[in-house]
Structure formats: structure tokens, C-alpha cells
């Protein structure tokens, strides 16, 4: 009996602590990586086909984002896990952001790797998105490491000035669906100044950069309808279409928009 007990103890001592750490997050418990953390919720029926990695808006957090149940539940209905990544002091430290203090490219790369290690999410199963300044974080992620994502679905936020050049981004720009409102005042289509040193970018100029880098064929742009919104769809990019949906609303990220977008990029209900 003692020998068997000793063998069991040796077995557990021999297991690296990281193995136990891999099983201790989810739900109310944040998943920690170097530099920060994220929250995750999985579909309750076990039908898991991918993940939607979402960057929250200004003055929010991963924990608060998980309370946005319409977005979370819509994501789960499409058989995707919902991940809310935590910013720093309610914001994000991307290029030309008013916030600084963290290497977001490295941090987000660690989030992607952790999602792969814990849940097996590969780039072809990883969709990124965000709202407002969180959408900006998603745009810089697509620009800097788009090869690690399958697609991007964002709301009410793009690059900041000075805008990156097309050559600053990776060639593997993922397919994009972006929603932006004509009545938007927080992050207008043309952008706006934040204090005296910072300025949000122009949405049309931002997507033109992505289309240029992705070698999209703007000459054959067409109209498509998503959630009743007429969108500009530029096809034949290196990795898929680039879609801009301009609606008549304001600063919002609606679940019905997300529903249409996730279906369009290949994750139906």
C-alpha cells in the first residue's frame, strides 16, 4: 500500500505545474498569459468549431465584456468560443494610441498560443474582432500578425493617425468585415482628434490600406447585403473578401450584425 501511495505521489510531483495551470481557467476564472489575461466561454453543447477573440472598447475590461450577453450568446450560437481579451487600464497600447505600457503584439501572440495550447485553436479557426478602440486593436493585429487569424469582424474602430503604410502590414491580411455608422460620433468615419496629440484614423483610408496590401481587386467591387445593410465587397484578395458595411446608426456593435458576419465568413449557426 505504501509503495503504491509513494508511486502516486512521485507521479504528481513529476508533472510540471504548467500542466495543472492549463486546466484552471474559464468561466469566471481568467486565463493568464505573460503580460495579461483573457476570459473564455465555450458552447454548452460541446460543438466547438473555432474561437472569436474580441478586444473590448474604451474603459471596459474582459470581465465586463463577458456581460455583453447578446454578443457572447450569438458567438456561441455559431459554435465558436467567445474570448474577451483584457486591455490595460481600459484601453490598448497599439501604435499611435494614447495608451502605452505593454507590447500588445507580443501579448496577443501569447494569447493566440495559449488558446492553441489549451483548446487546440489553430489560425484557421481563429476570428478576431473588437469594438471602438478595441476594433482598432483588432486592425493592428490583422496588420501585424494576420497569418494567425482566419478572419476579422469589427465594429466602429480602425487605424489611428499616422496610418500605417500597406508595406507595414503582413501580406496575409485576413478576410475583413467591418461595420461603421454614419451617425457615429465617438469614432466617426473620418476619425477625430483625441486631445492635442492623437487622432483616430479615417475608416475608408484604413480599409484601402488593407485592400492594397491584400491585393484585392477594387475594379470588380460589388454590393452585398449583411443584416439589411448594403456593404461594399472587394473580392479576390490574397485570402478572401474585404467588406465594409456602412449603416445609419451610431457607436454600436449589434448581435444581428455579428450573426450575419460570422455566417458570411464560414461559421453558420
Per-region residue spans from a language model:
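Active-site-adjacent alpha-helix of alpha/beta-hydrolase-fold enzymes
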Residues: 182-240
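Short, solvent-exposed loop/turn and secondary-structure capping segments
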Residues: 63-67, 94-96, 140-141, 164-166, ...
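Sec-dependent N-terminal signal peptides
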Residues: 5-15
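Serine-hydrolase catalytic machinery in alpha/beta-hydrolase-like enzymes
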Residues: 24-123, 127, 137-140, 144
Amino acid at each position: 500500500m505504501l509503495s503504491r501511495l509513494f508511486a502516486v505521489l512521485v507521479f504528481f510531483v513529476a508533472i510540471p505545474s504548467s500542466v495543472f495551470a492549463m486546466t484552471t481557467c474559464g468561466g469566471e476564472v481568467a486565463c493568464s498569459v505573460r503580460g495579461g489575461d483573457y476570459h473564455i466561454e465555450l458552447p454548452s453543447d460541446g460543438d466547438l468549431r473555432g474561437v472569436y477573440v474580441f478586444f473590448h472598447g474604451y474603459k471596459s475590461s474582459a470581465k465586463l465584456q463577458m456581460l455583453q450577453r447578446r454578443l457572447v450568446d450569438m458567438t456561441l450560437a455559431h459554435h465558436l468560443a467567445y474570448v474577451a481579451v483584457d486591455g490595460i487600464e481600459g484601453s490598448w497600447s497599439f501604435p499611435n494610441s494614447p495608451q502605452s505600457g505593454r507590447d500588445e503584439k507580443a501579448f496577443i501572440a501569447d494569447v493566440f498560443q495559449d488558446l492553441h495550447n489549451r483548446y487546440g485553436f489553430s489560425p484557421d479557426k481563429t476570428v478576431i474582432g473588437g469594438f471602438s478602440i478595441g476594433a482598432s486593436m483588432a486592425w493592428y493585429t490583422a496588420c501585424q500578425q494576420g497569418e494567425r487569424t482566419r478572419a476579422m469582424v469589427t465594429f466602429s474602430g480602425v487605424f489611428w493617425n499616422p496610418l500605417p503604410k500597406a508595406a507595414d502590414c503582413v501580406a496575409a491580411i485576413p478576410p475583413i468585415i467591418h461595420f461603421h455608422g454614419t451617425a457615429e460620433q465617438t469614432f466617426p468615419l473620418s476619425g477625430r482628434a483625441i486631445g492635442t496629440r492623437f487622432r483616430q484614423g479615417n475608416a475608408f483610408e484604413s480599409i484601402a490600406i488593407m485592400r492594397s496590401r491584400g491585393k484585392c481587386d477594387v475594379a470588380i467591387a460589388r454590393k452585398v447585403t449583411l443584416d439589411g445593410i448594403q456593404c461594399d465587397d472587394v473580392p479576390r484578395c490574397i485570402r478572401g473578401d474585404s467588406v465594409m458595411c456602412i449603416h445609419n446608426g451610431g457607436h454600436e456593435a449589434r448581435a444581428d450584425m455579428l450573426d450575419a458576419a460570422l455566417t458570411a465568413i464560414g461559421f453558420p449557426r
